[in-house]
A protein has these predicted regions:
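A feature for loop-to-transmembrane-helix boundaries and adjacent hydrophobic helices
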Residues: 1-332
């Protein structure tokens, strides 16, 4: 369903007659600078800063994170667009059925999907970690924190665009959007549901999960589990889902994101149980603990060398003093 972007947004069950009417375009010049783009940029920046701040906790440096992001961001944008185009391919055909390549790359007209970005990001991380000889699990663990914060913030771009909303509802927190000058719909604010869900997820990652990790990669699998659970729920409420071609289950079309989310939940749950309960890891295997042990051993070795040098210097000083005394005596 299409809603008007120049009409106000309200939450009548919470705030009565109060309305908010944001212009999707923040700056009107050229093709315009949209709030959606500004919010996505802010989301990426906040996610990057959090990941850099948390890097030391998993045994990495800020430079490791920054280097990866410089490669990942453009690839994630391409992945997000490609994913969307593949599942909405009919939108990018001309009247004679041929593919319209110009429209396919016109990302400024809208049309991206977060799962495409996640898939592209994982592939870039694999290549980067192999090239730099870094532990993939540690890198994706810190990336998971930044990604979830970015998703939490980024969903507010959907609010400014009046998109990614859910089905009709009468709940007190329903969101009112206008479909014409005289008609409106009241729907689930699914952008808000997902934003709050991700906020809880990033708080759990930063303050609970990371400090008690059993293995490198635990944050990553928790991210897939948590986000998958939330997205399975939220996607079931949305009215603008991408569908898996013409496939159905029990007569119902298959939502791409929901199917992928269920698969993510199952796989991540199995991986977490396997690595924590079935085949538990020794804490010393964590990259951060291994580096700490190596640094401690190196420091201990330096102290031993320093002590040996000190012991070698002290007898030499004593011998020199004895020589001076002998020399002085013979002179007298």
């Amino acid at each position: 369903m299409t809603v008007l972007r120049d009409m106000p947004i309200s939450f009548p069950g919470l705030f009565g007659a109060w309305e908010f009417n944001p212009d999707p375009v923040a700056l009107h010049f050229g093709n315009g600078i949209y709030w959606y783009g500004i919010i996505l940029a802010a989301a990426m920046l906040c996610g990057l800063l959090l990941a850099m701040k948390q890097a030391k906790r998993v045994g990495l440096t800020e430079d490791h994170v920054l280097d990866l992001v410089l490669w990942a961001v453009p690839c994630c944008i391409i992945g997000a667009r490609l994913y969307y185009v593949i599942f909405y391919l009919d939108l990018y055909r001309t009247a004679d059925g041929a593919l319209d390549w110009g429209q396919m790359i016109a990302i400024w007209d809208g049309g991206i999907a977060i799962y495409g970005a996640v898939i592209a990001g994982v592939l870039v991380a694999i290549v980067y970690c192999r090239k730099k000889k870094l532990k993939l699990g540690a890198m994706t663990d810190v990336a998971a924190m930044g990604l979830m914060l970015g998703q939490c913030i980024g969903r507010w771009g959907n609010f400014m665009n009046r998109e990614a909303f859910g089905a009709a509802t009468t709940l007190p927190w329903r969101m009112r959007l206008w479909t014409s000058a005289t008609e409106y719909i009241e729907v689930h604010p699914t952008f808000l549901y997902e934003s709050l869900w991700n906020l809880v997820g990033v708080l759990l990652l930063v303050f609970v999960i990371t400090g008690g990790r059993h293995f490198d990669g635990e944050n990553t699998w928790f991210y897939f589990l948590w986000y998958g659970l939330g997205r399975t729920w939220v996607e079931g409420l949305r009215t603008d889902s991408l569908y898996l071609f013409d496939w159905t289950i029990m007569g119902e079309p298959i939502r791409v994101s929901q199917a992928l989310s269920v698969a993510m939940v199952l796989v991540s749950a199995v991986m977490l149980v396997w690595h924590i309960k079935v085949r538990p890891h020794d804490p010393s295997e964590l990259l951060v603990n291994r580096l700490a042990a190596e640094n401690a051993a190196a420091e201990a070795e330096r102290e031993v060398v320093a002590e040996e040098l000190q012991e070698a210097v002290e007898p030499s000083v004593g011998t020199e003093k004895e020589s001076e005394v002998t020399t002085d005596g013979s002179t007298d």
